[in-house]
Amino acid sequence: MSVPGAAFVGELKRHGFDFFTGVPCSFLTAILDRLQAEGYRAAVREDVAIGLAAGAYLAGRRPVVLMQNSGLGVSLNALASLNLIYRIPVLLVISLRGYQIVDAPEHWVMGEITTRLLETVKIPYRIVGESTYVDDCAAMAAVYQEERLPAALLIRKGAVA
């Protein structure tokens, strides 16, 4: 069973998140469909989305960046040299392509190492589950708010639909 996209977005908004940007992924379609009508800002690259989110935070917004896990690799330098160093929080919503599922070959490596990459750079994360998504969102919102650090919600195929 899946979390409805509207419920997931509603949970993010309940925690005050109000600026959404990123690069699309089919695993995130239900979320993106919901956000399109609410001012979602598409970015050409994930590191660009991180920059947009940092600017939004400095302007008083609470940003979320949506991306595929391959985009985590693209955005690591921005996260490490901007967000982590200067404690500029961002909530990352990352699809888990190639993670414990059969997927296209280009997703195999990132699927295997996504959680280790996050652990290596000390970005807390939760893998979103249907029965745990409320707690998952709350836990990562707390990291964002209290520690002023990036935090990630990882979305498996079909977890949000």
For every predicted segment, state its role.
Residues 1-161:
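Thiamine diphosphate
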